[in-house]
Regions:
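Surface-exposed cleft-lining segments at the edges of enzyme active sites
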Residues: 50-52, 133-145, 172-182
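N-terminal, active-site-proximal structural segment of metallo-dependent hydrolase catalytic domains
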Residues: 18-92, 102-112, 130, 187, ...
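Bacterial N-terminal signal peptides
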Residues: 7-17
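Positively charged n-region of N-terminal signal peptides that target proteins for export
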Residues: 1-5, 22
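Metal-dependent phosphoester-hydrolase catalytic domains
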Residues: 27-31, 122, 180, 194-202, ...
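Active-site beta-strand/loop signature of hydrolases that rely on acidic residues for catalysis
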Residues: 41-48, 63-89, 117, 156, ...
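Short, solvent-exposed loop/turn elements at domain surfaces
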Residues: 50-57, 77, 126, 179, ...
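Structured beta-strand-rich core segments of catalytic domains in phosphoester-bond hydrolases
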Residues: 74-166, 274-277
Length: 304
């Protein structure tokens, strides 16, 4: 009888344990909120400047140092010539890049590039392309209106390996002299981003050669939001993003920016944790005539 009672007790205990295991292992129904995956990374824009007036060889170690200390995940850069681009690739082995030169020939040595650098371990490049700021945007090397030089946009579609989220980045460099060209450029950007990125989240980086009160900037705000205005906190927002290699321990201008990071669509659920200008100097020498603008932010991708 004692053995029977003990066996019965053991069976009951096993049954309870088995029921608990089943309850714990049963899949939980996902809430609407849990069907979103948070994504955060650091994105930047930086005109690293070509060789005039300060030679690249005098600055390249400083530029690489800023990359390493700021730990950019993805960045649109402007103006490097081919030899500078080759140096950056060699000095920054964690990064890959996409983008061609303003002529459309990546092998051309004496012309601007505006590539997108991204960490290979963090992102997969899914698609890429280019268009030019002219009346014939699909013709490489074309320019129009009162544009002084050839200007263009390189873009990439990326997948974040950590979350699977996908987004576009459009990296631009507007003309520095032609006001009509800059306004037309803003219109082309609006049209092309809408056509290419469609419903995806799209970032716009670049040297617009116009501040936040300029007409081209206003045209862009028809589609984009300025991440500076959305930031929870800002750092060095009273500094101008252009320094002309003139060292200063205080802001020289009243917070105007030639360089910008914008984001569309306007209804995207996102948080810009921080927007900052990085005014790093090396013994009172700046690595470029522009400061990098850097975002630390989070936004949510809906699971497909």
């Amino acid at each position: 009888m004692r053995h029977f009672a003990l066996s019965l007790l053991l069976c009951c205990w096993c049954g309870i344990a088995f029921s608990c295991d089943k309850a714990e292992s049963a899949p939980k129904e996902e809430s609407a909120e849990s069907q979103w995956r948070n994504q955060s990374f650091t994105l930047a824009t930086w005109n690293v400047a070509f060789d005039n007036p300060v030679p690249w060889d005098d600055r390249k170690a400083m530029v690489a140092s800023v990359f390493e200390t700021q730990d950019f995940d993805i960045i649109g850069i402007q103006e490097p010539w081919r030899h500078a681009l080759d140096d950056l690739i060699a000095m920054l082995p964690d990064y890959d890049y996409t983008g061609t030169s303003v002529t459309g020939n990546p092998a051309d040595t004496d012309c601007h590039n505006n590539p997108i650098f991204y960490k290979k371990e963090r992102f997969t490049l899914l698609d890429s392309g280019s268009f030019w700021f002219s009346e014939t945007p699909d013709i490489p090397g074309s320019k129009s209106w009162d544009s002084y030089g050839i200007r263009m946009c390189n873009w990439g579609k990326f997948r974040d390996k950590q979350t699977g989220g996908e987004f576009f980045l459009f990296n631009t460099h507007f003309d520095h002299k032609g006001e009509t060209a800059r306004q037309k450029t803003a219109q082309i950007v609006n049209e092309r981003v809408k056509s290419i990125a469609k419903g995806y989240h799209a970032f716009l980086t670049g040297d617009f050669n116009g501040d936040q009160w300029s007409e081209p900037y206003k045209i862009l705000t028809d589609q984009f939001r300025d991440t500076r205005d959305e930031a929870v906190r800002t750092e060095n927002a009273d500094w101008h993003s252009y320094n002309a290699y003139n060292y200063s321990d205080k802001p020289l201008y009243s917070g105007a920016q030639l360089d910008h990071i914008m984001l569309r669509p306007a209804d995207l659920d996102f948080v810009v944790n921080e927007w900052r200008i990085v005014n790093t100097d090396f013994n009172k020498v700046y690595p470029s005539d522009h400061f990098p603008i850097v975002l630390s932010f989070s936004f949510k991708f809906e699971r497909q």
